[in-house]
């Protein structure tokens, strides 16, 4: 694929849509106009604001305050970066010393920007109930995504979805924006590597890939500019396409998770400094902080939850997208040998259940699933640590439907069921919608509690109190509740090792 981006950046006034078969969003007249805005929890009292512009900024800045009409504080950085095939520069600024659980208003400094707002993070140990959404495997909507008119690309896997359907999951997130406090998205954003599924793109894959990325993050911005959007990698971030052992044919900017790193690498957190009074917890948290490698593996604390985001694609033995992985995508490694697993164990060992009783781990590829094949190398790497440190809930995607499993370990359901099990509860929330369609639920293992693939869907996780967690699945198009479950955990051990 021959790159045309050197000339595109030199001549930004050209009609962008002429560069590729897939349609680029138009370039604004003011090249400092912020687009593709996104925020993230960055620390106990801080958030990161990320956005893209069509020219590099010498000093990205954000004005902010607790009144929409009085943005009295300003934070700036020197962080404005790009990569070889991108038309845009990615900017990031961190807002620090925020009051907890407070509405802040902010304006990205530009002659063409508007005021938006967010809720600052809850402090670790705050036992106020709150909800989050799990949105995974979400792709672009429109002529270059799953709503292609008169094109039955992989439509055999969508038995009931009209191809002209609007992006119902993003619409539902917008309509319920006051009902959740942040989003976790462990992998598969945009599906830019599926440009190859659409014949019109075949002669200009480089531009098609970039155009789909720009479209998707513009579509997501009304959500991600207001709610912290916490992302980790999936297989569709790896390269310009998924044909095994051909990633060397991708342009340099479209290999090895380049856009994902460029977009999220400076906004995701590492690990929070422990607020536990226990010295061992502090030591483990400090160790995990040194080993964290955002946006691939990291953790954060929010109210009564400790959330760990892991990388199921690279950086462990036989990782599917690694240099010797089964997918042939030659991704990573992004850390030293065993760094991710050393981080994971240190981080889990640091969790003080008196402060953050709920321990949630999110990754892309599941090892328990219907309608697809579980990731055996992932299970070998991670499941033992899930059980040892008493992870309460595992959140995954990759298989394009919604699933819930009773607590299970090593393929055997926990006899305690949903009342104080030792084994983790697992969900798959991969039905948000993308060009590849939905996966049939197939044969269901005996520990399956719920499986749904008739329409696009997503999960809401509700932290009710220190001992009760609720997981709800919703149909995106209607908002109808599809499944609801409640997990009880006594959390009577401050540091759990079993």
Feature map (PLM): residue ranges:
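Fungal secretory targeting signals
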Residues: 1-22
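Metal-dependent phosphoester/phosphodiester hydrolase catalytic core
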Residues: 25-438, 448-452, 460-498
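Periplasmic/luminal catalytic loop of GT-C fold multi-pass membrane glycosyltransferases
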Residues: 441-442
């Amino acid at each position: 694929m021959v790159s045309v981006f050197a000339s595109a950046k030199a001549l930004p006034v050209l009609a962008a849509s002429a560069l590729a078969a897939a349609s680029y969003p138009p370039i604004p007249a003011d090249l400092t106009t912020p687009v593709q805005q996104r925020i993230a929890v960055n620390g106990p009292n801080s958030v990161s604001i990320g956005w893209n512009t069509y020219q590099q900024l010498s000093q990205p800045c954000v004005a902010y305050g607790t009144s929409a009409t009085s943005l009295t504080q300003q934070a700036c950085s020197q962080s404005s970066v790009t990569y070889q095939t991108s038309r845009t520069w990615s900017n990031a600024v961190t807002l620090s010393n925020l009051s907890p659980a407070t509405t802040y208003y902010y304006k990205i400094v530009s002659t063409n920007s508007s005021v938006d707002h967010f809720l600052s993070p809850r402090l670790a140990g705050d036992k106020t109930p709150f909800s989050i959404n799990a949105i995974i495997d979400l792709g672009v909507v429109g002529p270059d995504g799953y709503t292609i008119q008169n094109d039955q690309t992989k439509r055999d896997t969508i038995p009931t979805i009209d191809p002209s359907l609007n992006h119902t999951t993003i619409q539902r997130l917008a309509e319920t924006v006051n009902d959740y406090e942040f989003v976790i998205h462990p992998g598969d954003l945009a599906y830019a590597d599926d440009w190859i599924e659409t014949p019109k793109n075949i002669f200009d894959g480089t531009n098609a890939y970039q155009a789909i990325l720009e479209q998707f993050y513009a579509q997501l911005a009304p959500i991600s500019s207001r709610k912290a959007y916490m992302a980790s990698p999936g297989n569709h971030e790896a390269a310009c396409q998924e044909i095994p052992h051909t990633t060397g044919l991708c342009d340099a900017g479209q290999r090895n998770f380049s856009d994902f790193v460029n977009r999220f690498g400076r906004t995701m957190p590492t690990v929070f400094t422990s607020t536990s009074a226990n010295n061992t917890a502090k030591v483990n948290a400090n160790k995990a902080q040194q080993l964290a490698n955002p946006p691939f593996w990291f953790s954060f604390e929010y109210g009564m939850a400790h959330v760990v985001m892991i990388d199921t694609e690279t950086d462990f033995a036989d990782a599917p997208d690694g240099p010797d992985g089964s997918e042939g995508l030659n991704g990573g490694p992004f850390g030293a040998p065993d760094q991710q697993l050393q981080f994971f164990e240190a981080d889990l060992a640091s969790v003080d259940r008196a402060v953050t009783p709920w321990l949630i781990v999110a990754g892309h590829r599941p090892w328990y699933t219907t309608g697809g094949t579980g990731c055996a190398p992932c299970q070998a790497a991670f499941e033992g640590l899930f059980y040892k440190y008493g992870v309460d809930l595992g959140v995954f995607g990759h298989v394009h439907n919604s699933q819930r499993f009773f607590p299970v370990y090593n393929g055997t359901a926990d006899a305690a069921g949903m009342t104080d099990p030792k084994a983790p509860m697992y969900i798959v929330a991969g039905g948000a919608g993308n060009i590849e369609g939905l996966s049939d639920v197939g044969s269901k293992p005996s520990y399956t509690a719920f499986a749904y693939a008739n329409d696009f869907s997503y999960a809401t996780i509700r932290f009710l109190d220190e001992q009760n967690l609720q997981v709800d699945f919703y149909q995106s198009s209607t908002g109808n509740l599809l499944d609801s479950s409640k997990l009880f955990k006594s959390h009577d051990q401050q540091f759990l090792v079993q």
